[in-house]
Amino acid sequence: MSYIFLIIGFFLLIKGADIFVSGASNISKKLGIPSVIVGLTIVSLGTSAPELAVSVISSIEGSNEIAVGNVLVSNLFNTLMVLGVTTIIMALTIKKSDIKRDFSINILVTILLLILTFTTLLGGEDNYISRLDGIILLIGCISYIIYLILSVKVGKTTSENIHEELALESTNEVNIFKSILKLIIGVAGIIIGGQLVVDSATFIATSLGMSEKLVGLTIVAVGTSLPELVTSVVAAVKGEEDIALGNILGSNIFNILLIIGLSSAISPIAVSNNLIFDFVFLIVVTLIIGIMIFINK
C-alpha cells in the first residue's frame, strides 16, 4: 500500500507543480510583471516546489537527512540528466550573458553551502547546518531575486521572451480568478503530494533497512526533479534553449538558497560526514559543466 501512496504522491507533486506554474505565471502577466522575472523566478520556483515541499515537511518531522540528500541529488540530476537529455534533443549554444551570470551564481551558492557545512563539521559538536546558516541562505535567495528585478529595470537582462513559449496564456485571455484557483489547487497538490512521498518513502526505507540518506539520494530526489526535466525538454523541443538551461540553473539556485535555507531555519539539519563527498562531487560536476559553458563560442 505504501508503494501506491508513493506513486500517488509523485503524481500530485508533478501535477501540482504544473498547475502552480500555469496559475502563477498567468497572474504575473495579468499584473504586468516582466516576463523575464516570470521565467527566472516563477518557473524555477514552480519546478522546485516539489523539492521544497518534501524538504520542509522532512524538516518539520525531523527527517533532516532527507532534506539535504533530496537537494544534493536533485541538483546532480538537474545538472547531469536534465541538461544531458536537453542537449541530446537540441545542442545548446550559449550566447547570452544572463545564462553565464546565473551559472556563476549557481557555482557560488554551491560553494557557499559547502563552506557553511564544513564550518559546522569542524566545530565538532555542532555537526549540523544551523538556523543561522539557513537565514544566511534565505538572505542570499532574497538578494538574488532583488538583483534579477534590478537588472531588468536597468536593462541588464535581455531575455524578454524567456517563458512565452511554455504555455503562458496571453494577457487578454487570462482570467484572474481561474488563475488564483489554479494557484491554490497547485499548492495543495504539492503539499499533499510531498507529505505522501515523505511518509511512504520513510516507511519503505525502514521496512527495507535503508537509511534516510539513501532514500533522499535516490527515489525522492529523482522523483521531485521530474518537473525540471519536463519543463526543460518542452523548452528544447520548442527551440527555447535559454529557457531550457535557465530553468535548470534557476532551480539549482533556489534548491540551495530557498529549500536548504528554509529547511534549516525551521530545524537545524544534521550533516553526516559522508555527505561531504556528495557536496564535493556536486561542485566538481558544476564546475566542469560551467567550464564547458564559459568556453562555448
PLM regions with names:
Residues M1-K297:
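Hydrophobic alpha-helical segments, chiefly the membrane-spanning helices
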